[in-house]
Amino acid sequence: MTMKEAIATVVEGRDLAPAQAAAVMNMMMDGQATPAQIGGFLTALRAKGETPEEIAAFARVMREHTVHVKPRVSGTLVDTCGTGGDGAQTFNISTAAAFVAAGAGITVVKHGNRSVSSRCGSADVLTALGVDISVDPGRQAGIVQETGIIFLFAPSHHPAMKHVMATRQDLGCRTVFNLLGPLANPAGAAAQVLGVYDQKLTGPMAEVLSLLGVSRAMVVFGSGLDEITVTGETSVTELANSRITNYIVTPEQFGFTRAAPGDLLGGDPEKNARIIRAILDGAPGPARDIVLMNAGAAIYVGGRAATLAEGIRHAAESIDSGKAAGKLAALVTATRGAS
């Protein structure tokens, strides 16, 4: 299938077969598609609506073009990468949760990037925390094995994305690539907590993860956040060994007080780093509570807890024992020594 044929198919509202979607993605990743063709295709695809099968096919090709990291560890690799794009301007909740989950014994391979729609992306706050995000991919497996956590900076692992970056920026609207980042973890995480920017995406994205062979996942949308929230209800679509279930969780279920959105606001990287350090040092409040819920989810899908409630208890122990803060310190030391 050529790019022109793919655009014509999608403009007519017809879905692409997985092989067709893969062919299109290969052309974009290999630099064979022109900027006009990429823009036309992405816009038409968004207007049609992406199917789980199409998204999974795109993700498989993106994974094939990835610079991989293959740590030798026992246990499940877990990612806490979300789609972003919720516009809520919170502090970096899933980044803080990654350290807490790691402190509870989860091996975390967090995939992320610099800010796109917020003032501070995961890469930005980690830099402010002292982590060297530019560590060579060839050294990252060793860091995971040593510390139990690594940050996988997307541009270092997805060089083929350079062929579509300018067009994405020119379009200025969400495309399927906003969904693909969390689906292309360079370490091949088998379990994920994946936050999405729209409640309608929880089911389809869980289907995509299942098609991609992910064994355990929670796809979440929390009252406007791409996180499990303490400000209201969170819609969860859970994947467990090909079985998909839908349910709602609330902060009150786990003994937390419902918070106002303003309680979770972040700012620039330095401010967000201060918030995260305070949480890891044991400061109480809504920021701690939301991190506990999200870290608890990572602990749960990673197989260290039988329920989300048990995962949250392990998360609290991780912070209160100092292990979560210890993981941050270990990652800072390891990355600075590896660069």
Curated annotation (Swiss-Prot):
Annotated residues for binding of anthranilate 1: 82, 113
GO cellular component: cytosol
Cross-referenced Gene3D superfamilies: Nucleoside phosphorylase/phosphoribosyltransferase catalytic domain, Transferase, Pyrimidine Nucleoside Phosphorylase, Chain C
InterPro entries in alphabetical order: Anthranilate_Pribosyl_Tfrase, Glycosyl_Trfase_fam3, Glycosyl_Trfase_fam3_N_dom, Glycosyl_Trfase_fam3_N_dom_sf, Nuc_phospho_transferase
The keyword Cytoplasm belongs to this UniProt entry's keyword annotation: no
Names of required cofactors: Mg(2+)
Pathway recorded for this protein: Amino-acid biosynthesis; L-tryptophan biosynthesis; L-tryptophan from chorismate: step 2/5
Cofactor binding comment, as recorded: Binds 2 magnesium ions per monomer.
Binding sites annotated in the UniProt record for anthranilate 2: 168
Superkingdom in the source lineage: Archaea
Family to which this protein belongs: Belongs to the anthranilate phosphoribosyltransferase family.
HAMAP family, per the entry: TrpD
Function: Catalyzes the transfer of the phosphoribosyl group of 5-phosphorylribose-1-pyrophosphate (PRPP) to anthranilate to yield N-(5'-phosphoribosyl)-anthranilate (PRA).
Identification of the protein by name: Anthranilate phosphoribosyltransferase
